[in-house]
């Protein structure tokens, strides 16, 4: 990325007018944002870095500062004849976010079309204050490989499904790149994003994505990185770091749809992927099948429980962990220390819990740390840390 782009300030009308403050650092140049994040990371990990070892921190990886996000979570507001897709603003007003700069142009256009779809279907937006209405959220996910979409309508009940089905053929004829459509039923009168019941309105139930020639699949409830450009670099870096150890066996804990493990896999490596979300495991299994991988096992289990149930004799050469923001926790840290693999690759979306976990992983030292700016304009970022056995 050129210096001019990195040092430019993004102009966002929503932020300037005080309507949406989610991108709290959008008025800072990207280079400045990344410098602050780098400093934060270095301070948090300072206790684990030997003196005169600043070279452990590799240069941060950045991507575009707009049009990078592949997922939109839109609250549906307003009325059936005049719906608004966006957020509730700071003053309680409905803010239309269809032109949010984080979304690619084709995604912005589709969001505008979905506003008209809601109007044509006559779907009344759910009113939290009155506990009335039907349509709560519209969730839209984009695959960068073909510009295809997964579209979800979150409803209070089954009452709105018929209206969606009535208008859907015209929408799909206009936007054939919408490959998956589903309705999620969320009956609870609370600000919860989704419920347990998912009803597919298309034959397709998953969206294909591809990073570094690795096929990955997205289903409605499976977690997937929201910045494909930087996520692809994150997975590629993990692949290169793991290859340095030539492992014959590998665990991928909190594996999600298998992004890390599948990037590192080959038929010479025995790969075990563990993830509690069954939908994500189904996606990972499909990817492994497409890649022709034979020594691969993906299981829908709790990662901590899985590790506790294993003996030292089962230990792999290398373990990858990619936990949610809470980190891996003391119990799993203890299990990793006892298994004593050659190396542990830790991918973290919360450097505070990474630092906390590092206190409890015994017998290892950091050899590489790299920041990946998956979330421009926010305080958040991803970190890849390589721990090697003492």
UniProtKB/Swiss-Prot annotation:
Presence of the UniProt keyword Lyase in the record: no
* Organism the protein comes from: Shewanella baltica (strain OS155 / ATCC BAA-1091)
Name the enzyme group at the top EC level: transferase
What does the UniProt keyword field contain?
A: 4Fe-4S, Iron, Iron-sulfur, Metal-binding, Methyltransferase, rRNA processing, S-adenosyl-L-methionine, Transferase
Q: Which InterPro entries match?
A: 23SrRNA_MeTrfase_RlmC (IPR011825), MeTrfase_TrmA_AS (IPR030390), MeTrfase_TrmA_CS (IPR030391), SAM-dependent_MTases_sf (IPR029063), U5_MeTrfase_fam (IPR010280)
Residue positions of the active site: 349
GO MF? 4 iron, 4 sulfur cluster binding; iron ion binding; rRNA (uridine-C5-)-methyltransferase activity
Q: What is this protein called?
A: 23S rRNA (uracil(747)-C(5))-methyltransferase RlmC
Q: Where does [4Fe-4S] cluster bind?
A: 12, 20, 23, 100
Q: Which residues form a coiled coil?
A: none
| Record EC number | 2.1.1.189
Does the keyword Transferase belong to this entry? yes
Gene3D superfamilies (alphabetical): 2.40.50.1070, Vaccinia Virus protein VP39
Give the reactions, separated by semicolons, that this protein catalyses.
uridine(747) in 23S rRNA + S-adenosyl-L-methionine = 5-methyluridine(747) in 23S rRNA + S-adenosyl-L-homocysteine + H(+)
**Binding positions for S-adenosyl-L-methionine?**
225, 254, 275, 322
- Which biological process annotations from GO are given for this protein? rRNA base methylation
**Role of this protein:** Catalyzes the formation of 5-methyl-uridine at position 747 (m5U747) in 23S rRNA.
PANTHER family for the chain = RNA M5U METHYLTRANSFERASE (PTHR11061), TRNA (URACIL(54)-C(5))-METHYLTRANSFERASE (PTHR11061:SF30)
Judging by the UniProt lineage, the source's domain of life is Bacteria
The UniProt similarity line reads:
Belongs to the class I-like SAM-binding methyltransferase superfamily. RNA M5U methyltransferase family. RlmC subfamily.
Q: Which PROSITE patterns match?
A: SAM_MT_RNA_M5U, TRMA_1, TRMA_2
This chain is encoded by the gene named: rlmC
